[in-house]
Design a protein with these regions (language model features):
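Short, well-ordered alpha-helical microsegments
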Residues: 1-2, 42-43, 132
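Rossmann-like NAD(P)(H) cofactor-binding subdomain of soluble oxidoreductases
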Residues: 1-26
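Alpha-helix C-terminal capping segments
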Residues: 1-8, 89-91, 139, 156, ...
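Functionally constrained cores in energy, signaling, and assembly domains
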Residues: 9, 18, 27, 79, ...
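Internal alpha-helical scaffold of NAD(P)-dependent oxidoreductase catalytic cores
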Residues: 10, 25-70, 75-112
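Long, contiguous hydrophobic alpha-helical segments, chiefly transmembrane helices and signal peptides
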Residues: 14-20, 33, 75, 79, ...
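Histidine-centered active-site/metal-ligand motif
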Residues: 15, 69, 135
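NAD(P)-dependent Rossmann-like dehydrogenase/reductase catalytic/cofactor-binding core
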Residues: 98-161
Length: 161
């Protein structure tokens, strides 16, 4: 919004909260869309457009959209890079990443019913520092993976339910 301020009279934003890839179509009807406009007339137009695209439309100010985007990076981008790291580990040991898909499906399904903090599982969420230590020992040869594992495990240990 601030990009247009003072340059044009009527302006606004339609912000779909979704990951987009050329390789996969998405059902836009289910995508949350966030809108903001410089004035009520423009807001009405953008809202009408957004409601034609999605069943989930709401107004959100620019400052809050920035926080929404940060949350999306954690929820989507960082989760995916963790899957990339998992694939790297599996491939090193002759396993296909597809073995993770049922686990990931169940993880996402739980998030439809539970708050993420309540859905957290694994050794750190149980406070099992012995298993965490054994995993870190196995990862000693890969500094990056070891650091990520350590930081995430520490966060989970400190923020357990």
């Amino acid at each position: 919004m601030s990009l247009f301020m003072g340059k044009v009279e009527h302006y606004g934003v339609l912000y779909p909260m979704q990951t987009f890839s050329k390789q996969k179509e998405v059902n836009f009807r289910t995508i949350p869309c966030f809108v903001e406009a410089s004035d009520q007339q423009t807001l009405d137009i953008i809202m009408e457009l957004a409601r034609r695209l999605s069943d989930n439309v709401r107004e959100l100010k620019e400052a809050d959209r920035k926080w929404l985007h940060i949350a999306a990076v954690f929820s989507c981008n960082f989760a995916n890079v963790c899957n990339t790291m998992a694939a790297k580990i599996l491939e090193r040991h002759g396993l296909d990443f597809n073995v993770m898909l049922p686990l990931l499906d169940e993880t996402v399904a739980k998030l439809h019913r539970l708050h993420p903090k309540e859905a957290q599982t694994g050794p750190a969420s149980r406070g099992d520092v012995g298993v965490v230590g054994k995993h870190l020992a196995l990862l000693e040869g890969d500094k990056e993976l070891s650091e990520v594992y350590s930081v995430l495990s520490d966060y989970i240990l400190k923020n357990r339910v």
